[in-house]
Amino acid sequence: MSIKKFKPTSPGKRYMTVASKEEITREEPEKSLLAPLKNKSGRNNQGRISTRRQGGRHKRKYRIIDWKRDKDGVPAKVASIEYDPNRTAYIALLNYVDGEKRYILAPLGIKPGDKIESGSKAEIRPGNALPIRNIPVGTIVHNVELKPEKGGQLARSAGTYCQIVAKEGKYAHVKLPSEEVRMIHLDCRATVGQVGNVEHENIDLGKAGRARWQGKRPSVRGVAMNAVDHPHGGGEGKAFVGRKTQYTPWGQKSAGYKTRRKAKKSDKYIVKKRNQ
């Protein structure tokens, strides 16, 4: 994938870059794999803001992705590579020999016509999904499960991957994109290869309007607010925070303070923390 630049015919296009989308082979999605998606604008069921800075995005439909990859022993053929507005990665449409169609995350290097399989007997090839016990140590994987049969949860964004670094007993040591090393059960599944669209991190939106199309609203600094709205607010002129450290709008420390619970159940599965 390459990045496309524009001539500076306007201030918004001066630094704007987009993905060339050379890999995409189909414009219209598969209708049987679409679902309605309502824009909640960051509101909960009471209509109150639960997630700030969201709203006003372009209408879109959800693409139903096969996270579990549980169709064992049935080969499939990659029909097309498609754009998905709901995620940074591209998606691949699979046509199984029994007639079923499913979407998966498009791994790096996959193309229409490639053969894809799932199950313990599948080959170690990009796009194939296997239990971790059947994947050699050192292999790069993505869409990794945390619990068997729950569906992939780790390394699903564009360009991300995990690496199996060791196997011990019932667990494998997996290095995550955050550099954290975590123990994951050998029966959990993972897909071989790296997620495609690796140049996504280098894309420059170029103007505020493109962010608004994505549903991102402006972020207002706490020091620019009134004292009633934020712990950093108030004061005469451009006043400083006025406290020893920074705080969230709800009064919790947000700098120099560990916000993870000290006795979390998943701590026993973490071999190396991401900040060590």
From Swiss-Prot:
<dbReference type="GO" id="GO:0016740">
    <property type="term" value="F:transferase activity"/>
</dbReference>
<dbReference type="GO" id="GO:0003735">
    <property type="term" value="F:structural constituent of ribosome"/>
</dbReference>
<comment type="similarity">
    <text>Belongs to the universal ribosomal protein uL2 family.</text>
</comment>
<dbReference type="GO" id="GO:0015934">
    <property type="term" value="C:large ribosomal subunit"/>
</dbReference>
<comment type="function">
    <text>One of the primary rRNA binding proteins. Required for association of the 30S and 50S subunits to form the 70S ribosome, for tRNA binding and peptide bond formation. It has been suggested to have peptidyltransferase activity; this is somewhat controversial. Makes several contacts with the 16S rRNA in the 70S ribosome.</text>
</comment>
<dbReference type="InterPro" id="IPR014726">
    <property type="entry name" value="Ribosomal_uL2_dom3"/>
</dbReference>
<dbReference type="InterPro" id="IPR014722">
    <property type="entry name" value="Rib_uL2_dom2"/>
</dbReference>
<dbReference type="GO" id="GO:0002181">
    <property type="term" value="P:cytoplasmic translation"/>
</dbReference>
<keyword id="KW-0689">Ribosomal protein</keyword>
<comment type="subunit">
    <text>Part of the 50S ribosomal subunit. Forms a bridge to the 30S subunit in the 70S ribosome.</text>
</comment>
<feature type="compositionally biased region" description="Basic residues">
    <location>
        <begin position="50"/>
        <end position="60"/>
    </location>
</feature>
<feature type="compositionally biased region" description="Basic residues">
    <location>
        <begin position="258"/>
        <end position="276"/>
    </location>
</feature>
<keyword id="KW-0694">RNA-binding</keyword>
<protein>
    <recommendedName>
        <fullName>Large ribosomal subunit protein uL2</fullName>
    </recommendedName>
</protein>
<feature type="compositionally biased region" description="Basic and acidic residues">
    <location>
        <begin position="20"/>
        <end position="31"/>
    </location>
</feature>
<dbReference type="InterPro" id="IPR002171">
    <property type="entry name" value="Ribosomal_uL2"/>
</dbReference>
<feature type="region of interest" description="Disordered">
    <location>
        <begin position="1"/>
        <end position="60"/>
    </location>
</feature>
<dbReference type="InterPro" id="IPR022666">
    <property type="entry name" value="Ribosomal_uL2_RNA-bd_dom"/>
</dbReference>
<dbReference type="GO" id="GO:0019843">
    <property type="term" value="F:rRNA binding"/>
</dbReference>
<dbReference type="InterPro" id="IPR005880">
    <property type="entry name" value="Ribosomal_uL2_bac/org-type"/>
</dbReference>
<dbReference type="Pfam" id="PF03947">
    <property type="entry name" value="Ribosomal_L2_C"/>
</dbReference>
<dbReference type="InterPro" id="IPR008991">
    <property type="entry name" value="Translation_prot_SH3-like_sf"/>
</dbReference>
<keyword id="KW-0699">rRNA-binding</keyword>
<feature type="region of interest" description="Disordered">
    <location>
        <begin position="226"/>
        <end position="276"/>
    </location>
</feature>
<keyword id="KW-0687">Ribonucleoprotein</keyword>
<dbReference type="InterPro" id="IPR012340">
    <property type="entry name" value="NA-bd_OB-fold"/>
</dbReference>
<dbReference type="Pfam" id="PF00181">
    <property type="entry name" value="Ribosomal_L2"/>
</dbReference>
<dbReference type="InterPro" id="IPR022669">
    <property type="entry name" value="Ribosomal_uL2_C"/>
</dbReference>
<dbReference type="InterPro" id="IPR022671">
    <property type="entry name" value="Ribosomal_uL2_CS"/>
</dbReference>
